[in-house]
Amino acid sequence: MPETFVSLVGNLTDDPEVRFTPQGTQVGSFRLAVTPRVREGDTWKDGETSFFRVNVWRDLATHVGDSLSKGDRALVVGRLKARAWETPEGERRSVVEVEAEEVGPSLRWATATPQRANGNAKADTGTGAGSRKGGRR
């Protein structure tokens, strides 16, 4: 069955929750509120907000927990995953969640200083804002 990938940009509704499975694997989750902008005549208005539960695993869970918090604007790329279960009362429930491959802060209205997972800050290789020293384009 083909997988469905999505790219989302929205705001965290709460701080990410990071925990461990019984096997010791890090797992985290957060809710992302995504509100499209809709043009009505000469003005732009907020459209209907959609809420997505985003799951992150292993090191990504730790990095998200250390880097993002409630209200932060974030970008998420991941797979849609449908999950179904039955409650103790016998009711069938289902949910569609996003299993994230990539998560990062939005730089539209904020700045960030990337720091490698080993604790070393990303080296400044340029001579000023927007520099592309080294020929990478």
Give the positions of each predicted feature.
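OB-fold and OB-like beta-barrel modules that bind single-stranded nucleic acids
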Residues: L8-L12, L32, K70-A82, A100
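Hydrophobic core residues within well-ordered beta-strands of beta-rich domains
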Residues: V6, G10-L12, Q26-G28, S50, ...
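Acidic, gly/ser/pro-rich intrinsically disordered tails
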Residues: M1-T4, P16-G24, R39-K45, D66, ...
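Conserved positions in beta-strands of structured domains
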Residues: T13, E17-R19, W57, K81, ...
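Beta-rich strand-turn-strand
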Residues: W57-R93, S106
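Short aromatic-glycine-enriched beta-strand elements
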Residues: F20-A33, S94-E97
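Short coil/turn motifs at secondary-structure junctions
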Residues: D15, T35-R39, D59, R83-W85, ...
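Beta-strand/loop nucleic-acid-binding surfaces
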Residues: E48-D59
